[in-house]
Amino acid sequence: MKHPFQIIVADTTGRYLFTTVKNVLLVIDLTSGKLVGQWKDELDNSDFLKKKYEEKFDKENDSKRQKSESGQAKVSKIPTPGPGAPPIYNYIRALRLSSDEKYLFATTDSDKAVVIFTIDHSKDNCLELKKRQPFSKRPCALSVDEDRLVVADKFGDVYSIAIEDDQVVNEKELTPILGHVSMLSDVAIVSNDKKKFIITGDRDEHIRISNYPKSFVIKNFLFGHHEFVSCLHVPNFDQSLLISGGGDDYLCLWRWYEGQLVAKIELRELIAPFLTDSHLPPERFLTETSPKEISVARILTFTNKKTGLNILVVLCEQTKAVLLFEIDAKLSVRHLQTISYEDNVLDMCYIEATNTLISAHDSDKNQLFQQQKFDEETNNFTPTTETMDAVAELNPIDVNSRNDFLPLYYINTLRKRSEH
């Protein structure tokens, strides 16, 4: 069986699909069904850890090293993870295209790095590694500001690095442009009246609006969530809006510059039929009244080109459904459709050029991709007759069983638990 695809991103033309599976990046030409780009992260986790500790030990002063009874300096040993230590997975956590689609950015968990690729479709392999920039803490979210890549990490810091610069900077010399006291979950660069801002969301239900690039100046906070924030989405049809979601039963629709909460978009009643026992809290926190928990995995928006109606698409983690809403001119939100699938949806992307929603699935039958067409007359999606099985077969990662899968559902681990 094939390992599922974990992230999917399409270019604006809808011709190229960029996707990840384990530690492999693939670029697929959807018109020909051919693989046109590939990169595999060959980095060995143990080699990376060994290098890090060797650098640390080399800097130790011999005079400060412990002495044994014989008077000889003790040689520091490179530690190895003991029993019960959390595993370090070698996979790609985030994927993003530059605004001009000339670059592809990804994060690697193995060495806490961001990798930058140039995209050249005239070459046999359209991906060329430009730079691999390590960070002190693991990057978890990316945003783009023209010629700079904005990187948020799990420690709560945000960095800005030059896209065009090939030089790799020592991670200890990188200076954060802002910081949270909690783990960051998403980041977005926005503008208002030609002035730029950076929006950051974290595990502690905070959404912060800061000036950019002078991000030490905080404009305001957006208060409306009670659980973690996992998704920040600024729609192209109105960049004065922000749609946020995470561990709550609802999404928040904001006028972010004014700090105004315009609407709450309720999800529980709509997604409840697709919640299973896997959405219950871990056993040690489970009570008789524990609800099944919702975690927002992806938020997309687009505009019906025929009617001008703005559409919102929402994916909740580990569910076999996608929710469709309309947002009218008065910012009222109405549920339009629930798309149900046979298998859990892992990720999705919408291609406006072809009115196509592509979804990646956790499937034992190797039905790893599905696509739906948006009907501009009915404002609904319908399945296409074309299958993507041939495209899914380009997946190079074969596994024996689900036990060989990397963690596919981790967003809900952001949820804070009380021991009392």
Curated annotation (Swiss-Prot):
It comes from the Eukaryota. GO terms for molecular function: enzyme activator activity. Required for the formation of N(7)-methylguanine at position 46 (m7G46) in tRNA. In the complex, it is required to stabilize and induce conformational changes of the catalytic subunit. Pathway: tRNA modification; N(7)-methylguanine-tRNA biosynthesis. It is found in: Nucleus. This is tRNA (guanine-N(7)-)-methyltransferase non-catalytic subunit TRM82. The keyword tRNA processing applies. Keywords: Nucleus, Repeat, tRNA processing, WD repeat. SUPFAM superfamilies: WD40 repeat-like. Pfam families: WD40. Residues 59-68 have a biased composition (Basic and acidic residues). Forms a heterodimer with the catalytic subunit TRM8. PANTHER family: TRNA (GUANINE-N(7)-)-METHYLTRANSFERASE NON-CATALYTIC SUBUNIT WDR4, WD40 REPEAT PROTEIN 4. Residues 59-82 are annotated as: Disordered. Belongs to the WD repeat TRM82 family. The keyword Repeat applies. GO terms for biological process: tRNA (guanine-N7)-methylation. InterPro entries: Trm82, WD40/YVTN_repeat-like_dom_sf, WD40_repeat_dom_sf, WD40_rpt.
